[in-house]
């Protein structure tokens, strides 16, 4: 139906949905399927992931915007695919984002745990709530992370280079692999507690000048350039990690939404559902 503007996939059954390549630029897609896997190659006006099986949403398309309101989700942007933006807005959630392709922007709007694995490209991560963000990956390009004033208490951990701009009080844990990271305070109340477990000095730029946090030490640096609470680290920690996903299956029903039945176990589904372009 070419007049469909809102499509909802809703089921509690164990299913796998394949959405083939196609331009559905007038359709808002909502997925409310806590036991489903989704492989998406279609381009939509918007995508809202309300619930999905913790393991996998596989993105193969280019240019989609995804909002994650699920408590637990894993989004994989495959090589050659891209997302314009991912917004994470469910407080208390645990979200994994894996970027083998490109993500232009990630917006974290709630106190959630976000694990970000970057083998491709991420344009910017904006944090506007006291979230925990763990970054890893094979990328050698520094990932820009902007921590806004409303994110007091945010915690950022990275084993890959990052460029952090902090407008409030945050913790920044840098482990081996994060050499070359840059830190800047951008607000009157900014203070960055830098734990430096890299092999190099980490420089913190403030309006009053640049301060240094030596390797194997932790220091707090505020917006006035004051350095306090310097201690020696006892050990270095690497955080983050990725997990694999499974596919599952079910049946479709009409009315712009999908539901499925399952005769399989936790690993092997009954069948896979393909939503064809002609349906939507």
Predicted feature residues:
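Short, T/G/N/S-enriched strand-turn elements that build extracellular solenoid repeat scaffolds
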Residues: 1-186, 190-207, 211-216
């Amino acid at each position: 139906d070419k007049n469909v503007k809102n499509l909802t996939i809703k089921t509690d059954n164990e299913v796998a949905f394949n959405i083939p390549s196609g331009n559905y630029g007038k359709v808002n897609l909502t997925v409310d399927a806590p036991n489903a896997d989704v492989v998406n190659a279609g381009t939509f006006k918007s995508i809202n992931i309300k619930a999905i099986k913790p393991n996998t949403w596989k993105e193969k398309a280019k240019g989609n915007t995804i909002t994650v309101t699920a408590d637990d989700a894993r989004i994989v942007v495959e090589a050659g695919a891209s997302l314009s933006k991912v917004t994470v807005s469910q407080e208390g959630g645990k979200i994994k984002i894996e970027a083998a392709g490109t993500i232009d922007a990630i917006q974290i709007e709630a106190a959630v745990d976000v694990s970000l694995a970057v083998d491709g490209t991420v344009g910017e991560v904006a944090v506007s709530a006291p979230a925990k963000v763990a970054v890893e990956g094979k990328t050698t390009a520094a990932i820009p992370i902007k921590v806004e004033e409303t994110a007091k208490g945010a915690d950022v951990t990275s084993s890959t280079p990052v460029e952090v701009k902090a407008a409030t009080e945050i913790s920044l844990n840098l482990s081996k692999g994060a050499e070359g990271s840059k830190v800047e305070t951008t607000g009157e109340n900014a203070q960055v507690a830098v734990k430096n477990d890299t092999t190099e000095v980490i420089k913190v730029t403030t309006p009053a000048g640049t301060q240094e946090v030596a390797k194997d030490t932790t220091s707090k640096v505020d917006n006035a350039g004051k350095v306090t609470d310097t201690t020696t680290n006892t050990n270095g920690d690497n955080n983050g990690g990725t997990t694999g996903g499974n596919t599952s299956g079910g049946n479709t029903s009409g009315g712009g939404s999908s539901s499925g039945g399952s005769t399989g176990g936790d690993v092997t589904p009954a069948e896979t559902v393909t939503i064809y372009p002609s349906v939507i």
